[in-house]
Swiss-Prot record:
Main location: secreted
Role, per record: Kappa-stichotoxin-Shd1a: inhibits voltage-gated potassium channels (Kv).
Signal peptide: none
Entry similarity comment: Belongs to the sea anemone BBH family.
Gene Ontology MF: a single term: potassium channel regulator activity
GO cellular component: extracellular region; nematocyst
Disulfide bonds, paired cysteine numbers: 7-19, 10-25
Protein name: Kappa-stichotoxin-Shd1a/kappa-stichotoxin-Shd1b
Subcellular location: Secreted; Nematocyst
Ribonucleoprotein in keyword set: no
PTM comment, free text: Occurs in 2 forms which differ in the post-translational modification of Pro-6. In form SHTX-1 (Shd1a) Pro-6 is a hydroxyproline while in form SHTX-2 (Shd1b) Pro-6 is unmodified.
Length: 28
């Protein structure tokens, strides 16, 4: 789940209160 506010599309929580880009996003 997601804990707290979700990150932008294509990003996910880095577990330290920030967001990091989702490496798998848009890779088709």
């Amino acid at each position: 789940x997601i804990i707290g506010a979700p990150c932008r599309r294509c990003y996910h929580s880095d577990g330290k209160g920030g967001c990091v880009r989702d490496w798998s996003c848009g890779q088709q």
